[in-house]
Amino acid sequence: MDEAAAAEAACIDIASVPADVLFHPEHRTVAPTIFSMAGQTHTECSSPNEYLKWCNSALEKGADALYCSGSFKTVEMLSNEYIPVVGHVGLVPARATWTGGFKAVGKTATDAMELLKQVKSYEQAGAIGVELEVVPVEVANEISKRTSILVWSMGAGAGCDAQYLFSNDILG
């Protein structure tokens, strides 16, 4: 709860909140104005119905949006249930072996176009945003210009709508 209280005191607008913190009864007491996003991985919620159940529970506990690493069909299903969903594109740690390890993604024109395709798929599925992780700055800038959803940069430069930073980096 200390990080949540510190983020509130520092006027942080948006926070990625671990499920154990989100489900703590004091979370919304110490961080009433922060837009809180929480998530489960595709291994923790293996079906669309499991995601739906978990998301509804998280919204009841105070989440404002949910990360979803499930399929685009899962994102669409959640969106159709009026659940604000954020996707994840680029270096997705749980899938790093699929993209060649822990390194930048989107360095070739073909790979950059694939990232744009994924972002557009999230957009078409009804996501409110996407986290773009470890993507070349120029690619992130162009993707941000070509989508109507919010784009959070995590190691993808300042050209996105918001920066994803860790609490140690901004709170000390």
Indicate where each model-derived feature is located.
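Alpha/beta enzyme core
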Residues: 1-172
